[in-house]
């Protein structure tokens, strides 16, 4: 699935210049989050993707609400995006929950709001797919709390994702996202790279089958991370480059800086430093989000005599 690297950048990547389409009037009327004043006039997109779930599926229809939600989400404005969604149906409640859960993972804030939204989604779920999707979000919220050392909820995460696996049929649209999340749990909590790789490959196949480009950007990146750990530099570079390419094409701003940093880890100087500088610039434009990226962007300690 990964091999030679036809996508590795040979010329400077300019993440600002890659967003060339101006913001539409309808979008400017709803983009009022704290980051928007910094980004207006710098970044924009035309027909961008939107997703109903966290990392689960992208489409490019003309639904103004979903386009606005996507644009806010991509700029790290999850609260503003969630405020546009009335939780009056199971699907709407699940989408709102997914946004607030993603906010927790990227900002280390908003845990109570995400939990409240999740309880609403769980109460409204009627079908196996809806109950499975809610369980998947519970697993993700518990995983994020554990990973970020808010509270150890590893057992809850495993149980919730296991419950989701019993409810979401193989081949269903939500199964690829579930497989991916089981992969990150295996990699980062269980410390089982073999199980993680198998889960990521299932997720990648499912994301490809359902034309889920955003999820593919995550599976490419995590498979590349495992390849880098194994010393497979060319394979890792290819995967990281694919992840970055997809995120730039979709306009997924909040995920672009991490993708730049990951690719930098496979490059030699001066390219590695240039990629990290671009990542730092975007990180600052987004108000220091994702918070955990600050540790990777920090300059190395000065050498002492």
Placement of each model-derived feature along the sequence:
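C-terminal non-catalytic interaction modules
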Residues: 31-69, 73, 77, 249-305
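Residue signature of alpha-solenoid helical repeat architecture, marking inter-repeat boundaries
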Residues: 59, 94, 129, 134-136, ...
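Residue register of alpha-helical TPR repeats
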Residues: 63, 91, 95-98, 133, ...
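"A position-specific structural signal for the A-helix of alpha-solenoid helical repeats
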Residues: 67, 95, 99-102, 137, ...
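Short coil/turn connectors between adjacent alpha-helices in alpha-solenoid helical repeat scaffolds
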Residues: 70-74, 100-116, 142-158, 186-196, ...
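Tetratricopeptide repeat
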Residues: 81, 114-117, 121, 157-164, ...
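Short coil/turn linkers that connect adjacent helices within long alpha-helical scaffolds
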Residues: 88-90, 125, 166-172, 205-213, ...
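TPR/Sel1-like alpha-solenoid repeat signature
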Residues: 178-186, 199, 216-227, 239, ...
């Amino acid at each position: 699935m990964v091999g030679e690297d036809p996508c590795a950048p040979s010329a400077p990547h300019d993440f600002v210049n890659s967003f060339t389409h101006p913001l539409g009037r309808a979008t400017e009327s709803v983009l009022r989050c704290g980051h928007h004043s910094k980004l207006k006039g710098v970044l924009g997109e035309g027909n961008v993707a939107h997703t109903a779930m966290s990392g689960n599926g992208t489409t490019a229809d003309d639904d103004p609400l979903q386009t606005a939600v996507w644009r806010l989400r991509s700029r790290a404005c999850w609260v503003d995006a969630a405020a546009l969604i009335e939780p009056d149906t199971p699907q709407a409640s699940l989408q709102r929950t997914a946004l607030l859960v993603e906010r927790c993972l990227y900002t280390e804030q908003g845990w109570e709001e995400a939990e409240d939204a999740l309880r609403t989604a769980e109460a409204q779920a009627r079908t196996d797919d809806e109950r499975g999707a809610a369980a998947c979000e519970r697993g993700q919220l518990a995983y994020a709390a554990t990973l970020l050392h808010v509270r150890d909820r590893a057992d809850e995460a495993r149980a919730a994702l296991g419950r989701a696996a019993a409810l979401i049929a193989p081949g269903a649209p939500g199964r690829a996202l579930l497989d991916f999340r089981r992969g990150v749990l295996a990699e980062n909590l269980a410390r089982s790279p073999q199980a993680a790789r198998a889960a990521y490959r299932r997720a990648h196949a499912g994301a490809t089958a359902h034309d889920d480009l955003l999820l593919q950007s995550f599976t490419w990146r995590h498979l590349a991370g495992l390849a880098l750990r194994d010393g497979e530099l060319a394979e890792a570079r290819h995967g990281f480059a694919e992840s970055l390419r997809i995120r730039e094409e979709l306009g997924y701003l909040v995920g672009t800086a991490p993708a730049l940093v990951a690719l930098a880890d496979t490059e030699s100087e001066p390219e590695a430093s240039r990629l990290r500088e671009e990542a730092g610039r975007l990180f600052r434009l987004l108000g220091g989000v994702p918070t955990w990226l600050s540790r990777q962007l920090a300059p190395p300690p000065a050498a002492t005599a």
